[in-house]
């Protein structure tokens, strides 16, 4: 999923621009949106869903004849992005969250980081130019988004098994307590190398498709680092390739790790550390 955020002060035309982007992006793939609602409460007090939540339900799902609505106490941007990515959409358009690190299209004189383009008003937007900017953004993936992608592959009907690997940040090893890891990559080279590994592994007998995604930046203890998904005709062909994909990613892809522990921080290069 490629992400863009539209930011601006109130009444600057954010929703109008989001509408225009959604319409244009539909020509490129599936689209989902996220809206920052500030203090607005969707779960209206007194309704049955509100009563469920008030009684202590952590997640409430309401189903009507034309909608499915989920109410959750995990109300932060990362959870919203993961939820959107899990559906398998190709693009995520976010309205608001100007304090985030997301790539942004800014309306008016709003101050924010990572602004890729600034507009005076939505009707002055070159939509084609903005679409090209969005297409250049890195992919945001969850394990479920990769599973959704591999299930859409044209030859998936030949598959009898899908295997996955998820590497997470280990919090404790012997006497060492890790608080978080920090990953840096060699720009587009890392993605190119992962694509090369996937292409080569797909040539093996019985392998339908191979996908992998490695996160960068700061990742807290217990959080996901890397996902690998393999589809194969039979499990006997799947497991050796899944293991080879893990080992080759660790050995060949230019991604570097700094470990932040309770006793200090240091760079690590260890192919056995996932």
Model-derived segments and spans:
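N-terminal, polar/charged subdomain of small-to-medium soluble alpha/beta proteins
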Residues: 2-7, 12, 38, 54, ...
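Walker A/P-loop
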Residues: 15
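N-terminal phosphate/diphosphate-binding loop that engages ATP/GTP or pyrophosphate donors
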Residues: 22-73, 83
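Short, high-confidence coil segments that cap the C-terminus of an alpha-helix
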Residues: 28-29, 57, 86-92, 207, ...
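Glycine-rich phosphate-binding loop used to anchor ATP phosphates in small-molecule kinases
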Residues: 68-108
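Short phosphate-coordinating micro-motif centered on Lys-Gly-acidic
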Residues: 100-135
């Amino acid at each position: 999923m490629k992400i863009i955020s539209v930011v601006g002060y109130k009444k600057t035309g954010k929703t109008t621009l989001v509408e225009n982007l959604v319409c244009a992006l539909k020509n490129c793939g599936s689209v989902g949106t996220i809206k920052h609602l500030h203090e607005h409460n969707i779960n209206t007090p007194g309704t049955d869903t509100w009563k469920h939540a008030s009684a202590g339900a952590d997640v409430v799902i309401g189903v009507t004849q034309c909608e499915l609505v989920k109410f959750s106490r995990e109300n932060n941007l990362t959870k919203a992005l993961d939820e959107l990515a899990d559906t398998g959409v190709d693009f995520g358009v976010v309205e608001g969250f100007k304090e985030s690190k997301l790539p942004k299209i800014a309306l008016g004189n709003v101050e924010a980081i990572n602004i890729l383009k600034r507009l005076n008003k939505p009707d002055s937007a070159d939509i084609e130019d903005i679409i090209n900017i969005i297409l250049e953004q890195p992919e945001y993936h969850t394990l479920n988004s990769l599973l959704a992608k591999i299930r859409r592959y044209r030859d998936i009907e030949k598959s009898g098994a899908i295997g996955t690997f998820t590497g997470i940040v280990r919090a404790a090893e012997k006497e060492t307590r890790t608080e978080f890891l920090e990953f840096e990559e060699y720009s587009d080279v890392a993605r190119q190398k992962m694509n090369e590994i996937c292409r080569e592994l797909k040539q093996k007998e019985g392998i339908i498709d191979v996908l992998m995604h490695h996160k960068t930046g700061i990742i807290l203890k217990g959080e996901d680092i890397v996902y690998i998904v393999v589809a194969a005709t039979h499990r006997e062909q799947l497991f050796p390739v899944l293991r080879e994909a893990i080992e080759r990613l660790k050995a060949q892809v230019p991604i570097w790790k700094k470990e932040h522990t309770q006793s200090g921080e240091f760079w690590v290069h260890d192919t056995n550390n996932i």
